[in-house]
Each structure stands twice: as structure tokens, then as C-alpha cells.
A protein has these predicted regions:
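STAS-like cytosolic regulatory interaction modules
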Residues: 1-53, 64-110
């Protein structure tokens, strides 16, 4: 299943919302979105994984690549409530690398 992608501006932030599965078959959607981020002028990028049902190592690699591209110039926040995606991120130890908030309200609060 390809993840559905949504993109929105929220103030000085660009929010990329993913749904479904982020895996080898669908990771190109995330890569394309991150490439658009490079030219969008947003001060901060949020990747919303709230509706992601599954993420594999390819998806995790894409998130790490996104961090490398985005962080030197702007902030990056993962929005990821308790669930399958967060558990995979934690098992991989990436919760120590990324700023993770459980929802958009918490991300707004900082």
C-alpha cells in the first residue's frame, strides 16, 4: 500500500502527513516530499506519522536522510503518538536522535 501524503503550511512550518505503510514499496513518496522541503522556505518541518500503520527499515532510513537534509538549515519534528511507528522508532534507538511529539498540539507547545 502506498502511503497517502498530505502537505500543509502552518505558520512558518511545513507539515508532511503520511498515512498507511512506509516501506520499500512506498518510501519514494517520503523522499519526494523531503526534496520539496529543501526549496519551500519553511523554518521548521514536521513529519506527521500519526496515521502510519507500518514502517520498516527503509522508512527509518528515509527519516534519517530527511533529518540530514533538513536539520542543518531548519528544525525537524516527528509527530508520532504511541503506536506501531513509535515502537519501531524506539527499538531502532532513533527516539534519541529525533525530536518526537505525540501530537500537533504538543509540537506547537515545543
Amino acid at each position: 500500500m502506498d502511503p497517502e501524503e498530505g502537505e500543509a503550511r502552518v505558520g512558518h512550518r511545513l507539515v508532511l502527513g503520511l498515512r498507511g505503510e512506509v516501506d520499500l514499496a512506498s518510501v519514494a513518496v517520503l523522499h519526494a516530499a523531503v526534496e520539496r522541503v529543501r526549496t519551500c522556505g519553511a523554518a521548521e518541518v514536521w513529519i506527521d506519522l500519526s496515521d502510519v500503520e507500518f514502517i520498516d527499515s527503509t522508512g527509518l532510513s528515509a527519516l534519517v536522510a530527511a533529518r540530514r537534509l533538513v536539520v542543518p538549515e531548519r528544525g525537524l519534528v516527528l509527530i508520532c503518538p504511541d503506536g506501531p511507528a513509535l515502537r519501531v522508532i524506539q527499538v531502532a534507538g532513533l527516539d534519541r536522535v529525533f525530536t518526537i511529539r505525540p501530537d500537533r498540539a504538543a509540537a506547537h507547545a515545543g
